[in-house]
Amino acid sequence: MKETTTIVRVKPTSDLNTPYVAFTVCPNFHSAYKKDTLRNVYNISVDDYRYKSNWYPTKDINPDNAKEFFHNITYGLYDVIHKLEISTMSLTTPKVQIAPKEEGSIEYATFFTQYTDTYGRCYTMVAKDAILALGITKVTIIARMGVYVFLDHPGQHLHSNSRSKV
């Protein structure tokens, strides 16, 4: 897969009371689903899944195998995001690199999975106080595939009145 880089510059502040935007990274529309897995394992196409209501390949659907099916046909966090580079105002820590872990909370950021029909699994990065206190000046997202990056108000993932796509 080809890596894609997205850079977002923000007005820096080290005020922890100011809410910081959440970055939601989604596979682009054409990359949202694993076409080979749908075709070779489940014998359906992306169009069958998206547009013809062939949601699941079995009649015995339950919440556990529905989630397993969705995870099998969409991309995990590490498949989508290679790393984030965050530049700060700090003289001692001018740049921080974050290599995400599945659903893991790391020192400077937490990643949450967002489930969508349009983009498959998306991943929202919420900066922690440790990095916010350094004053973020730039966020560079290096993706493993074509992605959309949404800037959301915290807690309002993909709401049409509270997001921007970069």
What is the meaning of each model-derived region?
Residues 1-166:
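Non-transmembrane functional regions of membrane and envelope proteins
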